[in-house]
Amino acid sequence: MAEAALAGQLPDAQSGLRLLTDPGIELLPLLQAAFRVRFHHFGRGVRIHILNNVQNGYCSEDCNYCAQAKNSKAPIEKYSIKSDEEILEGARKAYESGAYRYCMVSSGRSPHAERIDHMSKLIREIKSRWPVEVCLSAGFLDANKARELKEAGLDRYNHNLNTADGYYGSICTTHSYGDRLNTLQEARRAGLEVCSGIIIGMGEKPEEIVEVATTLRSLQARSIPVNFYVHVEGAQLGAVDQLTPAYALRALALFRFFNPDAEVRAAGGRESNLRGMESMALYPANSLFAEGYLNTTGHMAEKTVKMVEDAGFFVEKIEEE
């Protein structure tokens, strides 16, 4: 499969399903094949992303996996938008910690015009101070909002599909899968890179994981965060699937084969789901989060960098001009 991917011949759905479910496909040769594709496009470099949850809670949506959803009973700290000083300080720390990209995440259905103006100002300030790429995740966009963010210098917009179209109604009822697709398409039309991924382990079928990989390929997603579900006490979706490290690694390999030149990230839940096999994620994936997620903790940057280097990889940074 590596030879086919390197030649531009991408796998079909049946081949993808076999990668996830066929015990006759041994894990280590699969990871080695995925690494050949990863190495061709990214070498041994690893891009570290650091999130800043700039607004937490107060969300109108009912995504049942999310601790911030309107019907969640999770005991999270709710706060409106952080001060400019806090957000800029987060960017400075991200850069000094070795981050390739600083990702600002704001809860809510869609940012109003004043919020877009505010975020655009912050994006310009960050880009003027530090050589770091900037990603924003703030809900649904229309053409005008996407265009303003692009003009401000935003590199990438994140809006996760999270699961397949046919399963989406099982995890959310306040908006549709089509709403998410529309935002990704508007971001692309504005010239923004698209970041979109999945949460694995919410009760979906293997076929639906393959479907998401295929959809992201059609959207030309440049960044794919592969999250592994972690139940937060009080969230409406309980503990659903017990993922094994081997299954999680197979999923990362799947996304690499289906999206050979995309940035594939071992994202939320990697620590608790990959466990002792965490460093093996670097064979298919070329990107990691550090310093935690939205409402769950993760490894600090120093520990993440050490894991990367111990595994024979290196942290990739943007060169200063």
From Swiss-Prot:
Which pathway does this polypeptide act in? Answer: Cofactor biosynthesis; biotin biosynthesis; biotin from 7,8-diaminononanoate: step 2/2
* Required cofactor(s): [4Fe-4S] cluster; [2Fe-2S] cluster
Q: Which reaction does it catalyse?
A: (4R,5S)-dethiobiotin + (sulfur carrier)-SH + 2 reduced [2Fe-2S]-[ferredoxin] + 2 S-adenosyl-L-methionine = (sulfur carrier)-H + biotin + 2 5'-deoxyadenosine + 2 L-methionine + 2 oxidized [2Fe-2S]-[ferredoxin]
Q: Which positions are annotated as binding [2Fe-2S] cluster?
A: C103, C135, C195, R265
Its Enzyme Commission number? 2.8.1.6
Bound cofactor: record note: Binds 1 [4Fe-4S] cluster. The cluster is coordinated with 3 cysteines and an exchangeable S-adenosyl-L-methionine.
- In Gene Ontology terms, what is a biological process of this protein? biotin biosynthetic process
Q: Which family does it belong to?
A: Belongs to the radical SAM superfamily. Biotin synthase family.
Q: What is this protein called?
A: Biotin synthase
State the species of origin. Magnetococcus marinus (strain ATCC BAA-1437 / JCM 17883 / MC-1)
